[in-house]
Amino acid sequence: ASQQKVDLIVFPELITSGYELGLRFTELAQRVPGPTVNLIAQRANEYGVYIVFGMVSKEKVESVLYNSAIMVGPDGELVEVYNKIHLRGEERMAFREGYKLPVIDTEIGTIGLMIGYDLAFPEVARSLVLDGAEILCVCANWEAQAIDEWKTYMRARAYENACFMVGANRVGEDVTITFGGESMVVGPRGQIHTSLALETDPESGAPLEGFAVARIDLDEVRKYREEFQQIQNRQPTVYKSLVRRY
């Protein structure tokens, strides 16, 4: 990818550990910044790119773990940390929920970070967009048996918000879960700019590792937001139930 002079690279969720680790998450968790972040930041500096990747992070209190998305920049510095807000299943026993949705202004565009199951909640993408995001990066470990959800959510969030979605989804297997791959870049009208959907094993049909590169034009975001008015025509005064605690 670096040979094609890319500006932004996105990796899947929890790339330094795997997904089904239970108590072993505590062993593999690192502080941020720490050895893994520093190593990837060095690579970002070496190739002059932004890198977003998922890992297990921990606070000074050793028992407090987060499922995190880390962004490092071309200057080799830590840019942002996002801790996954929407945890599902056994994640809830391993991780603490995050509580902030950071938006990062960069010279390549304004970027928001999401992780996996966050994608199922339209409020996350909309909140990031209302705070200025033009590109939403999603680090994911989406299961193969639910891959239609992944594809639908990625396109839906792009349509709803007239933004670019950059989603990296894991392939392979953990203890009981098979992951669905199909990483993709989706444009503000739901058009798929690039996808790894066809990167499959010829015998089993299972998704394979790979990477895809797309060139995007942020003028499309401004054009379609002006044309379709998804943001301007909102009526937030009638959406009170969205923020009511049930």
Located regions from the model:
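Short helix-loop capping/hinge motifs at secondary-structure junctions, enriched
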Residues: 77-80, 191-193, 221-222
